[in-house]
Every structure is written in structure tokens, then in C-alpha cells.
Amino acid sequence: MKNKLVLIDGNSVAYRAFFALPLLHNDKGIHTNAVYGFTMMLNKILAEEQPTHILVAFDAGKTTFRHETFQDYKGGRQQTPPELSEQFPLLRELLKAYRIPAYELDHYEADDIIGTMAARAEREGFAVKVISGDRDLTQLASPQVTVEITKKGITDIESYTPETVVEKYGLTPEQIVDLKGLMGDKSDNIPGVPGIGEKTAVKLLKQFGTVENVLASIDEIKGEKLKENLRQYRDLALLSKQLAAICRDAPVELTLDDIVYKGEDREKVVALFQELGFQSFLDKMAVQTDEGEKPLAGMDFAIADSVTDEMLADKAALVVEVVGDNYHHAPIVGIALANERGRFFLRPETALADPKFLAWLGDETKKKTMFDSKRAAVALKWKGIELRGVVFDLLLAAYLLDPAQAAGDVAAVAKMHQYEAVRSDEAVYGKGAKRTVPDEPTLAEHLVRKAAAIWALEEPLMDELRRNEQDRLLTELEQPLAGILANMEFTGVKVDTKRLEQMGAELTEQLQAVERRIYELAGQEFNINSPKQLGTVLFDKLQLPVLKKTKTGYSTSADVLEKLAPHHEIVEHILHYRQLGKLQSTYIEGLLKVVHPVTGKVHTMFNQALTQTGRLSSVEPNLQNIPIRLEEGRKIRQAFVPSEPDWLIFAADYSQIELRVLAHIAEDDNLIEAFRRGLDIHTKTAMDIFHVSEEDVTANMRRQAKAVNFGIVYGISDYGLAQNLNITRKEAAEFIERYFASFPGVKQYMDNIVQEAKQKGYVTTLLHRRRYLPDITSRNFNVRSFAERTAMNTPIQGSAADIIKKAMIDLSVRLREERLQARLLLQVHDELILEAPKEEIERLCRLVPEVMEQAVTLRVPLKVDYHYGPTWYDAK
């Protein structure tokens, strides 16, 4: 194999990594973002290049031989941030662990070390890769040397060969120093010739080749001022070229044999990653070494032929293993228990037929600790078995401690808490279509290890939750809610399939009519769903203005089409066609596919541990996303009907809950007063920002005020509001300014919560749910701004989510206490959907709003609107 040398500009890559990534730190408070980014780059290079030789070059100090020639060389550079300086020793440790030599040389820069070693390697016939963020190094490009310059971040790079240097600059690599000689380089404080920029410099070098030739040919150059500058600053041009030239014969005391890559010291790498908290790299290392076959310490357990009393303790960790994505119809393949007496595996056909075990499962006084108890509860319900007494759910506990860490299985949570004696589900079963259940001994050991992990992790996670004041959030909100959601999922929602099919036929007719009209306006038939064909019709044939292009042609995205709508009638029809098509494929056909063949219902699955705000989402199907803006979309709700004759659908939703939460959290007197007086908050806001009386508020003013109100909740900028309302940024800024003048407490809250997030690293909801914001201190403006908006919004949106969850629990209790048949079916953001016998509706009209409005006590009243009817559509 041909020798390949990789040369890395250590300082440059470290700087790039530091500024590309948010400030990260380990549990000791040591900053690690530059080391993290450097590691990403290093792993990528080693995997892709597979070098035989490698070297990382560093700058030795601030003074080099260039300073002796020009004292102000690199003058004016900003001080290295202390958060970066403290990471250079860690970088050295990283390179030692990887067994990659690092080298620096007094009075020389890293560039000179790289230039020298590249020249030596070239002479020996090596292929050479240079990695840096400094474009000066493109002067090294040659048939054997490729220079890779980091662009955004550290893993996005541009490769420079002699051909690409010519393509990019119009000059050869050798002429890069001449370019710097004429135009200078602000980043290195190389002066160049005043008045000469890149364009002029390139033009001169294309004509004359070198700085020396340019200076020898001044009389042939056009432009008196240019000639004058070249004559006056002749010495500066030659000096600048000298400063820009990379030294290729520095006294580097390394041979090529000294930088042979021998592979990492795995033990040291793992130890360093653990110290730095680089869990994702540790996970990747585990996967690459086939973690599924990694030997674990032995664990005693019994594969039982029958259920015994010692298994059925007063408290035990329980695993009811359901293998498959959709637990409504996936099989239960095994059951495991761990308690103070031991660890046990039970075959499902044995356990689920044993009266003692079934009684234990349903006994509220027998405490169970589990992972994703809802999944097990639903799977058991399909077998007519009830699960009660769950006192700890590892999935929900881990979710509350850090909602950004998606806990896919027990092993993922265990790893986060330094518990290693369990394998991942993927390692045991495989994934996707290749997922299979292993032989019984392997399965039994896996499930027992999971049960043992759950048993071991309850105490440390509960301790952490107590320290965060989140223990009640788990035990009084999320865990009780899991049982309620299990009931809702199993109950399902009845679907009128005939009505859905009828809607599908109607949509097909509408689509065909819209399609015909589009063809008429286009003057030809074409594939409307093909962006390429659509682009050709709109921009080539109809000559509409081109607003945006993609790699493959014209952009026909929704935002582009909306801007084009005023230009031609066809655009409006295309947008309508797309909307109808999505309704047909996603909602009509999609819903029909998931209707249960026996129950005639759709049984969704609620994601309780997914969003970082605490809101629920649902899948298979996503019933929280049934469209409401388009009338055809709203009509889909006509297909959702009660499951019993003479029953009705009852819907209740919180009115403006997020704005009410904002009033409470911000303690803004004007906002509080408006809600207490029962004013229309959007009308009130319109009065304030437009300075008009209530009678003079127009529908358009109220619409704009509504956009301001909800925009403020999401920390909207003047640019975002301008886009939403189709007004100028200046007008949007004035709206926001007037809003804050009317509600100063809101402005104070926004400022305070961002500062609090920067100090603590997280924000909390009213019920102590946390969201961590590592990007809140990012040096990248866009990244930091997004984190700041998230800090403003999460306490509001998250508190609203907490409130409706509390209402669901309270409502379930009241329905049971009052022995009503009414049952919860769905939660859709701020709305609860129930079904109930007609004779209970009058009581629900009193009970449901009462319970929802009293779920929590705020400084402003909560308000609930309710409706009922024969379908979900009618309950509006």
C-alpha cells in the first residue's frame, strides 16, 4: 500500500472546533467543546484516509522568525479565549491516547512544520493530506499534496488540488504567496499594497505571474493610482510575499519514521472519553467492537417452569417483553422479575395462565418498578390482563432528568448512569426487518439483566429527581398519566370507514377537477407531483419569476409557491392540489390502513417521553395532526364517531392557555387584569399596539394582534413577525415595542429567563420540568438566538403541557368517583376528547370544565370551552 501522510494544523482545527460548537463542559466544569470537535475531525480522518503516517503540528509561541522581519506580524489578533486555552492540554492528552505525535518548533509556526514535512514526504513518494482552517496552506497543493480546508464546523471541508486552486482563485498554488504579497492578509496583519484587493491582485498575477514581475512591469500597468501605489509600496509587497511564504525547510527534528501511525491506545482513549463525558464517542466505540457480543459479568438467575411465591414479592422489578414497534399487536415473548430474593425468567404461556401471577400483576399493593410501563400495560390489556401497582418507571424518570436524551431502551439509560451489566435490545434482537427473537437462554438472560438494571437504578434516579425537586412530577403526574394513556390507547377511537371511503372518493373527484384546471392554465399535461416538470412549466413556459433554485433545478417548495401566487392563477390551484393530495394519502388512505379489523377503531400510541417541552405526541396514527385549517381537512373529523349507540363525542379545550400561563409567570399587571376582567385578549392587545378604542378595533387589527400575542410566546423576532403578517420589519419592530410598552412585565420576564438560563443551563416549568439549553452560551449568533427563544417559550409551553396532564389525571379520578361511563379518548394539545352516553352529557358540561379549570391555581382564571355532537367534527 502506498504511504499516506496526514498533517493536521492543530491550532487552526482547535479554533474552528471551539467556535463551531457550543460551550460544553464535563461534570468537573472543564470546557470540552474544542476537544470534542477535534475528536470528531480526527475520527473522520482516520476512518476515511487510513493514514500510514500522521502528525499534528502546533504553534510554539507568539514570536516567530517572521516577527524579526516584521514586528507587527499577526498584530491585532484577539486574545485566545480562556475557555479554549484550558483545552490545549486536553488536546495533547487526546493525541497521546490516539498515539498520534504532536510537534511544535520554537520560532516557527505550525504551517512551517507542515510545509517541511509535506516536502519531505513528497520526495519519498508519499501521498499527503493537509488539514487546516487556514487557506494560506493552499500554496502547498501539488500533484501529491491535497489541502483540505475546514468550512462550516470541522467536518465540512473543501479539498484543494492544483486544479481546484486554479479553479477557485484563477492562480496556481505557487502564486498564492504572490497574491498575499499584493493584497495582504488582514488575519495575519500582512500589509500588502494599499489599494489592491483580491480582484486587482489576481488580474495582475494572471498577466505578470509573480510579484517581482509585476514590480518590474509597472509601466505596462493601467491606472495611475495603482502604478503610484506599486512604486511607493514596492518593498512592502516583497516583504508581504516573504511573510506569506510557508517555510519548507524548517529544522524539524522528526523523521518520517517517527510519525508512523500505530493505532490508538484503546484503554487510554476510553478513560479519557469517560473523564471528558464523551458518551456518544464511547457508544460508537462499543458498537464498532460489536457490543452485542461483549462479555458481561455473570449473573445468577432461574428459568422457571412455574410461578412460585418467592417471585411474587411485595416489590419487584418487572419486565414484560414486547418485541415489535407497535405493541398493540406485537407478541409478549418473555417475562422477567428481579427482587431481593433473586432473578427469574418466566415463559409468557406459563406466567399469563397462572392465577397467582395474574393476581399479583393486578394487585395495587404489590409494587412494581418497570421501564415503559405503558407499553407493557397495553400489551397485557389485549390479553384481558390488568397491570397495577407501578411505583417507578425508569423510562419516565430518565426522561424527566434530561428530556433531550432519547432513552431507547434500558441499556441506554443504564449507560447514562454508569451501569454496564445489560446489553442493548438492538444487540440482542437486531433491528428493522432483521429483528428476531433469540434462543430461550439468550432471551432469558437479556430480560433478567434488564430487570436487574431497573431494580438497581430506581434508587439513584429517584435521589437525583429529589435533588431536582422532580420526584413528585414523576410519581404524581407522569406515572399516573401513563396508566391513563394506556387506557386511552386500548380503548381507541371508532372510525366510520364508509364515511372515510366516501370522503376519499369526493377528494379524488376534487383532485381531478383541480388537475384539469391546472392543465388548462398550463396549456399542456404534465406530472404535477414532479418538481422538475412543474418547474419547467412555471418558470420556462409561463415565465414566472425565479425566486430560488436547488441543486437539481427550480425550487417549487410551498413557501416559494405562496410568494408566486399573485403572479399567476395556476399557482393557487397547484397549492390546493398539494393540500388535497396530502389529505388523500396521509389522512384518508393512512387512517384506513390502521383501522383495527376487529374493533373498527384506531389505536394510537402516545409518546410520553419524547418532546423536550413535555407535550404528548402520537403515532400510528398521529391523531394530533388531523388538519383543521382546510375545510376538507376538518371534515375528516366527521369519520371519528362514538363506539356505542346513543353516545356522543364531547370535546373540551383550554382557551388561550399559553397566554394565561405567560400572564402568571411574567406577573404582568395589565395582562393579569385583562384576563381577570374576561376581556378578549387579542382585542385588548390590538387596542394597545394600534392606540385605538375597543369599538375601533377592526378584524384585521385583531388578527395582527393575535399574531403578536402568540409570536411573543415563542420569542418571535421582528423578522419573523414581518414574515407572518406580510409587513415590513420596521412595522413589526414597532408592534413588538408597543406590546412590551403595554405589558412591561412580559419584557422583564423574557430578559430574566434568558439570564437565568445562561446561569443555570436550564429552564423549568411550573411543576419543575426541566429543559437543558447547552447552546444558550454559543458564540454562533443563530444557534444562541434559537436557544434564547427556547428559554422564553419552554416554561410557557411546558407549563401548559403540565396543566393538561394534571387535568387528565383529575378528570379520570372524578369520572371514576362519580361512576360515569364517559371515557377519555384523545388529548390533542390543549383539547381533551371524550365519548359518553347522551344521558351523561349534561353532567359532563358541568364536570369537565370545572375539573380542567381547577387543575392548577394561577394568578389568572383558566377558561375551558366545550362542545359535543355525533362526531368529532360536530363537537366544535
Curated annotation (Swiss-Prot):
Organism for this UniProt entry: Geobacillus stearothermophilus (Bacillus stearothermophilus)
Molecular function in Gene Ontology: 3'-5' exonuclease activity; 5'-3' exonuclease activity; DNA binding; DNA-directed DNA polymerase activity
Polymerase as annotated region, ranges: 469-876
Catalytic activity: DNA(n) + a 2'-deoxyribonucleoside 5'-triphosphate = DNA(n+1) + diphosphate
Family: Belongs to the DNA polymerase type-A family.
GO biological process: DNA-templated DNA replication; double-strand break repair
Record protein name field: DNA polymerase I
EC number: 2.7.7.7
Subunit: Single-chain monomer with multiple functions.
Domain (5'-3' exonuclease): residue spans on this chain: 1-310
Region (Subtilisin large fragment): 289-876
Thermal dependence, as annotated: Optimum temperature is 65 degrees Celsius.
Swiss-Prot/TrEMBL keywords: DNA damage, DNA repair, DNA replication, DNA-binding, DNA-directed DNA polymerase, Exonuclease, Hydrolase, Nuclease, Nucleotidyltransferase, Transferase
Lineage top rank: taxon: Bacteria
UniProt cross-references to InterPro entries, sorted A to Z: 3'-5'_exonuclease_dom (IPR002562), 5-3_exonucl_a-hlix_arch_N (IPR020046), 5-3_exonuclease (IPR002421), 5-3_exonuclease_C_sf (IPR036279), DNA-dir_DNA_pol_A_CS (IPR019760), DNA-dir_DNA_pol_A_palm_dom (IPR001098), DNA/RNA_pol_sf (IPR043502), DNA_polI_exonuclease (IPR054690)
Any matching Pfam family: 5_3_exonuc
Annotated function: In addition to polymerase activity, the recombinant enzyme has strand displacement and 5'-3' exonuclease activity, but lacks proofreading 3'-5' exonuclease activity.
Misc note: The enzyme from this organism does not have any 3'-5' exonuclease activity. The subtilisin large fragment (residues 289-876) has wild-type polymerase activity but no 5'-3' exonuclease activity.
